[in-house]
Amino acid sequence: MSRSTALLPLLLLSTAAVAHDHDHLHYQATSPAPAQSAPQRTPAERNAVITATLPEDQAAMKAHVMFLASDAMAGREAGTRDYDIAAQYVAAQFYAAGLRPGGDEGGYLQKVPLVAYRVADKGSAMWTPAGGQPQELVFGEDFVPSPVPNAKETSLSAPVVFVGHGIDAAPYGLNDYKGVDVRGKIVAFLPGTPEGLGGEERAFFGSAANKAALAAARGAVGAIQIDMPRAGGRQRPFATLARYYDAPRVTWANPDGTAHAMTPATPVLGTLSQAGAAKLFGKGWDAVVKAAASAKPAYKPLVARGALTVASKTGFKPMDSGNVIGLIPGSDPKLKDEVVVLSAHLDHIGTNDGGEGDRINNGALDNAIGIASLIEEAKRFKTAATPPKRTVMFLAVAAEEKGLVGSDYFANHPTVPLKSIVADVNLDMPILTYKFEDMVVFGADRSTLGPIVRKAVGAMGLPVSPDPMPEEGIFVRSDHFRFVQKGIPSVFLWPGQAGPGKAAVADFMSHRYHKVGDEIDQGIDWSQGPRFVSVNYAIAREIADAPERPVWNKGDYFGTLYKGPMAAK
């Protein structure tokens, strides 16, 4: 799973997120916590744990994780040979399970043309006040540039308008654009969101990419973020941004070799410091600083009298990867052309640079065990007494840890008609180190998938519990959200936190998440693997065989925003 938006430095909020709208979640420029590996054992002791005899169904899941989370896979980072080997393994398992290929040219693989992009120089920024002389904005003191995904060179000059947090969310009583004309202008906004938004909404509206999209829809020609520690929750000095200004980002490539951008006509140009903002907005900026320090900040629009000119260069490096796709055709004459997608990400974060000792982030729970569940779920479908009524797609995606890139590529280049996809059920990082007593299904309350999920989970003797971490905004942080952005009802499954779950999840997230300790011998309860698969299968089967396709609940924000099928009442 991608990192929480709360953990991201401002740099990535203003740059990496422009290509992938969760500020994603997946980038890591924060200082890493000290690595904690699995309990120290001798090689013989470790092998005894790994090779311990298990029942056949548990051993089948463990075998997948043994391979995918082995040191030989070097952390399965997308764009590497190690990931490619892992993808071939999944393709072979899909073949062995009897799935039909659903990728390119009759195969199981869908090529995903990844591209890394980064600022190629420090660029330049110049502020020319109305009737005054040009003033340079000093790199690292006033301004830090962002890479522009879809252009090797960028040069833009336009007036600037400050619009608070840059949010327009009418259902929540927020509209920073009220009475403001930003056509032909550069929009400047603060990071983060106002207080009072729920976790999912806060994560969504706080995304720099989504803010740029709002600006683009209103005719803005560019966007720039303004550093405000109180407003964005960040306490690092602005100079820290300069150290990471040229850190690479990853997305999928356009045919010309540039990178995909959500808002190609409205690039995020970089980040202004408070000193830089003061140069643009003069004494008017004092009111913003004062408001940011208040208990309940409220910002008024500001127009900078003059023009901001920004020039920068972006470099690109291609690095191919791939999704893995298998299909079980539907059996019902009326429903077989509709597709239920079951997704899980195959990649992890690779190896740590430098240092001594273990440097491999094996990703056993994140997300080798999710892929193992997907493979075993495919076997359940193939060996069932009757085939599903709808077609079921098993989708192992690349580059989730880079910003949901593989799923975004698939959503924009589907191998089946996009309109035929009726739902996505996503598996990402099930923490199976305890006997789970409930299930958490993120997004269940947003569509008619909710009753389907509750029926299936209830038949397994388990309750569906509410989101235990609403502040994390998990619904917008994994691959299913790329389907949501296409208007497709989607859910994301996790074992719940009842009983021992809360302590187990906290232990994993604190000590092994995105660290070298996420290994096969960390204490996984393999008896829970088949249970988790059974729950997933029951949910997917209910969706695949339901007489009606899922629709969004009437008035749901994301269903409305992305124009998905909506319930009548």
Tell me what each language-model feature is.
Residues L137-V138, K152-E153, K178, A253-A287, ...:
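Metal-dependent peptidase/peptidase-like ectodomains
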Residues K379, T383, W494, P500-Y562:
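His/Asp/Glu-rich mid-to-C-terminal helical/loop segments that flank catalytic regions of hydrolases
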Residues A74-P194, V303-A304, F316, D320-N323:
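Noncatalytic luminal/extracellular "stalk/propeptide" segments of secretory-pathway proteins
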Residues E45, P129-A130, F139-G179, T258-G363, ...:
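Soluble metallo-hydrolase cores and metallopeptidase-like ectodomains found primarily
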Residues H20-A86, V90-P101, G276, D337, ...:
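N-terminal hydrophobic or amphipathic helices/low-complexity stretches enriched
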Residues N47-P55, D71-R81, P113, G123, ...:
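Second-shell loop/turn segments in exported
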Residues F204-N210, L214, A231, G350, ...:
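Acidic/histidine-rich catalytic neighborhood of metal-dependent amide-processing enzymes
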Residues V138-H260, P329, D337, R359-N362, ...:
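Extracellular/luminal Protease-associated
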